[in-house]
Structure formats: structure tokens, C-alpha cells
Amino acid sequence: MKRGFSSGDLSSEVDDVDPNSLPPAARPIQDQPTKPPVAGGPPNMPPPPAPGQPAGAAPELSLSFGAGKTPATAAPAPPRGVSAPTSPAKSRESLLQRVQSLTGAARDQGASILGAAVQSATQRAPAFSKDKYFTLLVLDDQNTDWSKYFRGRRLHGDFDIRVEQAEFRDITVVSSADTGPVVTMAAYRSGTRVARSFRPDFVLIRQPPRDGSSDYRSTILGLKYGGVPSINSLHSIYQFQDKPWVFSHLLQLQRRLGRDGFPLIEQTFFPNPRDLFQFTKFPSVLKAGHCHGGVATARLENQSALQDAAGLVSGAGNDSHCYCTIEPYIDAKFSVHIQKIGNNYKAFMRKSITGNWKTNQGSAMLEQITLTEKYKSWVDEISELFGGMEVCGLSVVVAKDGREYIISACDSTFALIGDTQEEDRRQIADLVSGRMQNVCRPSMAQTGPGKLPSRSSVSSRAESPTDEGVAPTPPLPAGPRPAPMGGPPPIPERTSPAVGSIGRLSSRSSISEVPEEPSSSGPSTVGGVRRDSQTSQSSTISSSVSRAGQRPPQTQNSVVEDAEDTMKNLRKTFAGIFGDMXEIANKKRGRTASETSSGSGPGSVPSSAGPGSGFSSSFLGKQFSFAGKGEGVISTQPTQRPSEEPPAIPTTASSAVRPESSVSVSDSRNTDTLTERAGAGYQPVTNYEQQERVNPFDKEPSKSGSAASIHTSSSSSISSSSISSRINRNGNAIQSPPPPAGPPPPPPTNVTAVGSNANSSSGYRNSFSSSLSKDKTSYGNYGSTTSVETITRMDTNTTNIGATATEAGEASGVTAITNISNSDGIVAPTTGTITTSVTTNDWRSAIGMRSASVYSAPAAVTTVLPGDTSGYDSNSIASQGEGLNNPSDLPSYTRPSYSRSESNASKHSDLDVIFGDSKTTPASYGNGKYTRAAGSISDADMIFGGPPSNYKTDRFGASKSMSMTSGGVGSGNGSGSGLGGYKIYDSIQNAAFSDFSDSGSMSSIGSHTKRWSASKEEDDELDLK
């Protein structure tokens, strides 16, 4: 198609160019100079097309190029970007003049239409509240406008999110222990640099604080000093400011997961660049300092290139701060970037198409690939570092042979890539909004009589998001942050008692989310203060659901009020009219908002709160919903037992306004009502869940020395991961004896009775199976209320087995009948037989199974090993005659630590072997923590095969003491007593070596003779990591 121009100098500009073949954004604009536009929009001047509508199908603005649509007087203009070959400057200038002169009226009409649309949208949208908002500080460059991702989001129903975006170089932070941090940000207004100050309630960090020569870690320190919560946590952000430090933590993951489970690239660290000359493996990659985006990274082909690079690095800066790392060069096929944003995962494959060995530089092909379970597990492990990270990433290089190498990890400052950047930013905004909903809470000072809600943790300023002036509020001590009349401290609403990032902070109860009436009662106000000061474990979803279910009329009224009120004075004047309609209606009925939601008076439980009653989330100032018998708890805690909660809630909550002990949290002491059990026997933990921690940087399970605080509301809460002792630490030759040469022989049949406590001497044997059926239901004679792991019994192979039944009451080696009392004092008769066989009695030639979790193979104790135990009296005929070394009594311990305590009275416990006492001392009985004692050999010798002194130094390091807890065990009460026996449990655990001491210790069965000593000689804590 050829078109002619009315202007002669442009007649040859658009030859062979079809405007309809161009994309909509590049289609040319046609001028109409001889026909002025008519006001009101004639057919040749309709409104502009809707966004995304093709230009050919759009209503005409006298600018269309469709055939038959151009008026006779219209002169087509050339397309943009196509210039005449003879005079490009002239044709471009004339084109701009024609376009500017032609589109003036169309621009005016479009502006009027756009203004009307904006005005209508503004009328429908809620107005920004100048007093009720939280300030979000976003540290990122100016390429991304984060304010649009938070526009329209509200916290607690009627609080806006005000976004302050800046780079690290543009802000300074001054933090005070009393008033919190004050951020001063430089802004440019009309070419003039103006500084304004504000207090941030939350921080989103998307820019690396340290990159090359720029180092803004002091800003992170100031924000941390002020206790500002953030994503990611300021703790993790600071930990990521040295790449070797992060890589050292990746090495710890590799040691735990294995090289195949976590294929980390081999890397060598040099704290000083002068030491680089020692490296001899090439080709390699040198990385100097802490840089991003492939900066300060070089590929070295030989020793000469290494010398040149080392010289450059040495002369570039201070030697003490210029560390280097060298890793082997991988001839990569492509690289993979794995990112995690909350619960959203993505994986991208990036392959260079320009031959650059750095795939993040030059031109590269980027493709989103399927996230494998392996990639997901890797990035999940990364997210658990440094107290947990919501946003993190991982870089993997895939070699041409298909092998994968993890080269680096990144935090929330990684660059978003691919076509899903908008989606990723919205997901980050969702994370920030959800966290701010939990940690940003208005002060209780705004709920007092005659006061309207105002910002609590943010300084009150008179400027709007679009104000022109600058608020020069100096130190900002006069803001509403300090609450009067003994309110909460200045900044507690932002942080937990221990940290400021991921602590357990409550999302306000309904009594504090809306302003109270001036006539609200005093007890209700006090209860509201108490409830608001408590912390909650609810998530964003549970708090939102609970809040929406509590007061839908209040939320609607607050939205309507914010949409209609545009001036602060009007809000003050009409607060009583357009306030909380639900609160007014409730007060007409003689109830307050808290009474309506909880079904009772302020802070108390109604008399009708029976087993079927339910309590909403505003009852205790927590986002909990007690529905029925504790089965509707919206919490991260396990559900309480149905038989215990109905009496527990009225009992603890009847103390009016301070019912903090009625709900079990990991940092509060529980009452006995919630933690008592009908039987003190072993309760298997089937619904154990990780409790939310006050300290977000502590990823270990909750640990405490108090018996009342180590139990959750459901069951015991000591996790198995807290038992962190390591057997075989230092590679002693005694640790690995050869496998047994044959089955262990049984004790001799010529058994003589031993004068000892019949109950205690037979309790140990009765706790195991009387046959070789590998029965797992009757071999545990240990009870513990803190049991998480189990000990699996595995019988050894024997020959010539013959079972012998005996009469009850005998205290001989083949007697296995006694009365063992359980935890409730009920005497349960237990009958059984002891398996005996006639073979040689030298059990040291081949013995039992050692720990399967540590040694995975049978072990044997021979007389030629240094651990010769022939001198111990447990090898005697009497001790073997008692059946103590019977083949059916040799269990296999599948725990990472040796954690068994014995109950037989004829010999001492394992403590003498573990703690290294080989002498014979007078035995005694007692309660409490048992430390080192003396006596004869026990099963520890048989299993591990070493002398007693080695168990103290080799097996458990420098451990000197041991704590033991036995549930359902009575105190020792003399010889012949039947009240102190052990109960038989399905899954057993008694004393365990861990990095802390269990409390609530109880004594084992009583015996005056040949028991371990209860003397507290060395009461040190175990350190077995």
C-alpha cells in the first residue's frame, strides 16, 4: 500500500510500509490539519480506545489508518521511526510538529475523560487515613515502585500501609532504646534536597547492604537496635554480609545431608590474598571479597594467571578485609536458579548464548523449569538457616556430564528474573502484609475514653502520602508511642520479648481493634490492656478468619468511615455517629464487645461454660478459638485432651482479668490441671508439633529446666532432636570390636539364691520377654513422661533354648514372677519365664547387639581387647545365675545415645561404666539426679566392649553427670517392698544423654544393697554435641 502526503517534503517517507501490518504500539498517527475538532466528540473525535484494544478496531480519533475510514481531507503522517533517506532530521522535526499540532484537542479531551474516571474511582475507593497507618520502609533501588503493590491493603480493618522507599545511601538511622529508630530520608523537591524523618514499623530489604566497596551494615545495626521487624529477619540479613560465612553454613548442611544429598562445590578459603600462591589446581575460579552479580570473579587457567590476580587483589585494599575463595571451574551446560518466596517455589534455567562462562552476564536464554523435589529440599534447607528466611534462593551449576554443584545461596536481596517478576513481587507484598498484620499493633492508648485511634508505633504526622511539605519532626519523642498510665513500653507492639522479626506477636483482640465508648467500664479497659499485652501464636490466616468472624459490622463501618471522612476534624466530630454500631447495639443490651464475643463478662467465664461451650478469640486476648472440648483451637499447639480441657478452662480463667496460664505456650508455666494425666505411664507423642518460638533465631526445640514448662497442652514436648550426644567421637580403637564368633551362651543352671531384694532383683528380668519371640510389648521397665524415642529390643541367637517356669516369690536366677506396681499404685501381677540353656558361661566371647543407630553391625567383646572385663563381679557365677546376662535380656539400643537405667538390685547400673568408676563402693539408694557411682559391669560393657574409663572419655567426651527421669516410679522404701517397682511400657525411654538436664527426676525402685549411689558428686550439665 502506498499513501501520498499533502506535504511535498514528506512524500517519499512511507513507501512500501503498511501501517496495518505494524503492531498496535508502533502504528503511525494520522494528521487532520484542515478540519478542527468539534467539542463534544463528533464521529471523527470519539474517546480514545480502551487499553489493550487493537487500534484498527478502536473508535476513531481522526487518527485511523483503516481503508475507507480516512476523510478526504486527511493527510496521512509517516510512521514513527521511518525517516526519509535524504533529510532525516527535517522529516523527524516535521513529523513531531504535525503530531503535536494535531493531537492537542484529542489530548485535552482524553485528559478530561481520564480525570472523570479518576474522580469516580477516587470517590469509590476508601480515602487514605492520615492518622491510622503503619509505615513500611522498603530498601530497594528506584527501578521498582513498591507502593503500587501495597495500595489498597489494610491492617486490622482500617489501618493503611504507607510505603517509604529508598536506597541505603539515601537514609540514616538513629535508634534509641526508649523511642525506637528514627529514619531520616533524603528527598528531592523541585531540585532541592530535603530531609524528612519517620519511624518505620516494618522493613522490607531488597537491596544488598554490602556490595563491593559499599557497606551499609551500620544501617542494619541501627534497625536491629530499634527492634524493627523485617523480611527477611535482620539477623539473617546481617549473617549474609559475608559470603564465606554463608558458605561455611552450607558446609554444615553438607556434613549433615551428605555429599550426594547436598552436592556443594569444593571451595578453598584464603583470609589473605598473599596466601593465594599456594593454590595449584587449575582451571579455577577466584572470588574476592563480598560482591554480587559476578563482580570480582575471575577464571584462572594457570599459575601465572593466579599470580597476576593475587597481585591485583593484594594491592586493591586492606589485606585483613580482602579475603578470597577459590573453587574449581565447572564447564557448565547451564545454571539453575531456585527461589522460594513464602510457600511459592520456582526454578529457572539460564544458559548463555554468547559463550560467556558467567551465565548472569551477557546474553542468556532464560527458561522456567519444573521444580523437582530435590531442588525443593535444597532450598528448604537453606530457608532454615539463620533462624529462618521467608525469601531465599539457591544457585546451582549443571556440568556437561550432568553433575550438579551448589555454588551459592542468597537471601531476600536476590534479583527477580523471568516473566513472573510481577507475580513474585505480589507474593513478597503478601508476605509483608501478613507479617505486618501480626507484628504491627496499635497502642492501647488509643482505646481509652474520649480518644480516637491514632498510630501507635509510628510517629503521628500531618502529611498525607501526596503532601508537598516536609515534616521536620526532630527526635519525635512526643508521638503516641509511649502509652500513658502504665501502659506497655514504648516499642513492645512491634517486637516480641526476645527478637524483633519472627517473634510470636499477637494480632490484637477485638476489644482493642476499635475505639471503645467513653462510658466503657473500668474492668473492661483493664482487661483489654492485659489481653493486648499478651502474645499469640496465630498465623495471618487464622487471625484474619477469627477477626472477620468476631466483628463484621465493625469492619464494614470502619471502611465506610474511612471512605467518607477526608478531614481529621470531621472524624473527631462524627466519631460517635459513624463509630462502632455493633458496640452501641451491644451496650444497649448491657454488654460490651468482649462480652459479646466471649459470651461472658470481661475476663471471666460464664457459669454455663461447660464441656460443650466455646470461646472466641477475644476471650484471652489471643487469636485462639476454643470450640467444644478443645478441638477447635486455632493455634500451632497440639489439641488438648477432651477429658482435661473442660475443667481446666473455668479453673484457670476464673481469676478475672489475668488468665495467662489457661493456655499452654512454650514460654509460660502450665498449671497442673492441664498437664496432669490419669496415669503417669508412658504417653506416646503422636501429635507432636513444633511450637512457635519466642526467639526466631533458635531453631532448636524448646528447652527448659522447669518441669512445668517442658510439657505442652497435649503431651510431652521434648523432641528427639534435643538428644545430641555422639558416641565414638574420637576414633578410639576400642570402639569397634570384631563381630561375634557365635551366639552368646546362657548362664549356668546351677543357680544359687542371692540374698537381695526380691522385687528389685527380678524386676529387670520381668520387664523383658520370657521367650525369644522378639516381643515388643513387655520388655520396658522404664517409664518417662518425656519419652519421644523408643528402644527396640532385639534378641540374640541362642542354642539349646529351654524355658523353665518357676514359682512366684523366689529370688533365684530363673525366677521371673513378681508384682510390679504401676504409676497409680495398682499392683499388677506379671508372670513369665526366663529362658535358659546349657552352654559355656563365658559370655564375653560373643555378645549381643550394639547400638544400631551408631554401629549398624553386631559387636563382640573378647578377652584380647583392652576392654577386658573379666575382673568384674558381674561375670561371676552368682551374677550370671541371677539371669542378668541371659540372652533374652540383651536388647539393642537404637538411640543416638546410651540411655538405659537398670532396676535389678544385684548389680549397679550403667552409670558406673559411663562415668568411669571401676572401684567398688558401698551402694545406696535415693532420689534425684544420679551422678557417678561404683560397682560392677553392666550392659554398656557388653554392648560397646570397652573398659569403663573409655566410656567417659571416648564415648561421651567430657560428660560428668547424667539426668534421669522415670515416670510412674515410687521412691525407694526399703528391702522387700512391692510398691516401688517399674511398670511395663510399650515404648520405653528412661534417662537420656542430651544437651540439657531433664527435671522432675524420681527415684527408681528401692533397694538398700548393691544399688548405684545417689550422691551428687559432680553436677555438671552434659555437653555432648
Swiss-Prot record:
Presence of keyword Phosphoprotein: yes
Protein name: Synapsin
UniProt subunit comment: Identified in a complex with Syt1 and nwk.
Annotated spans, Disordered: 1-94, 439-784, 872-910, 995-1025
GO molecular function list: ATP binding
Subcellular location: Synapse
Biased composition (Polar residues): 651-673, 726-735, 750-759, 872-904
Phenotype of gene-disrupted mutants: Mutants show no obvious defects in brain morphology and no striking qualitative changes in behavior are observed. Quantitative differenes are seen: mutants show faster habituation of an olfactory jump response, enhanced ethanol tolerance, and significant defects in learning and memory as measured using three different paradigms.
Family: Belongs to the synapsin family.
Residues carrying Phosphoserine: S539
Keyword Phosphoprotein: yes
Region forming the signal peptide: none
Biased composition (Pro residues): 34-52, 472-492, 736-749
Comp. bias (Low complexity): 454-463, 499-546, 594-626, 703-725, 760-772, 995-1007
Gene Ontology, cellular component aspect: synaptic vesicle membrane; terminal bouton
Amino acid composition bias (Basic and acidic residues), ranges on this chain: 690-702
